[in-house]
Regions:
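Non-Sec secretion/translocation targeting segments of pathogen effectors
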Residues: 1-18
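A short acidic-Thr-Gly-centered motif at the start of a beta-strand
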Residues: 14-21, 126-128
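Short, conserved alpha-helical segments within structured domains
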Residues: 16, 88, 115-119, 139-140
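Alpha-helical substrate-recognition element adjacent to the catalytic core
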Residues: 19-114
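Residues at the starts of beta-strands that form the adenosine-phosphate
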Residues: 77, 133, 153
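Short, aromatic/basic amphipathic alpha-helical patches
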Residues: 92-99, 126, 146-151
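Conserved Lys-Pro-Asp/Glu-containing loop-to-beta segment of HAD-superfamily phosphomonoesterases
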Residues: 119-142, 147
Length: 154
């Protein structure tokens, strides 16, 4: 499998399989969607870098992982759409692989715009590359509302 890296105005990422206008893609956020904070974890006072350093060890949410695996097994594509900064691409891919989370594409924010703006660009990119974006799985009400405004279930 060949990985193609890309960089846009508000995002960076990697595409493991090409877009396909005959396929549905589902987008998953990482933090607080695919990951679960350990009981008692408090990120109050942590910098973003400290939070992302700690997140390397967060467990995956088994129910969300199972959902992603089920969607992939029926032939749908999986995209990871996260506001994590671009510098966290490799470690995020490592975490996804370690937790057996399937993905065809991964997109991260370049940090120059608010995360919600970057997430909207990610969803637009997916709409351009696939038949449709089936669902956005995300913990942010702002991102969920933005997806609905684009006609995407969330």
């Amino acid at each position: 499998m060949t990985m193609r890296r890309f960089a846009g105005e508000r995002l960076v990422g990697a595409q493991l399989t090409p877009g396909d206008k005959n396929k549905v893609v589902h987008a998953f956020d990482v933090d607080d969607t695919l990951t679960m904070k350990p009981d008692g974890f408090d990120n109050t006072g942590l910098t973003k870098d400290q939070f992302f350093d700690a997140a390397r060890e967060f467990p995956a949410d088994p129910a969300v992982v199972e959902l992603a695996q089920m969607l992939a097994s029926k032939g749908d594509r999986i995209a990871i759409a996260t506001a994590r900064p671009a510098a966290r691409l490799e470690e995020t891919m490592d975490w996804l692989n370690k937790n057996n989370i399937p993905y065809d594409q991964i997109m991260l924010s370049n940090g120059l715009e608010p995360s919600g703006v970057a997430k909207q660009e990610m969803l637009q990119r997916l709409q351009d590359d696939y038949k449709m974006v089936g669902t956005l799985f995300d913990d942010s009400p702002y991102n969920i509302e933005g997806a609905k405004m684009q006609g995407i279930d969330a």
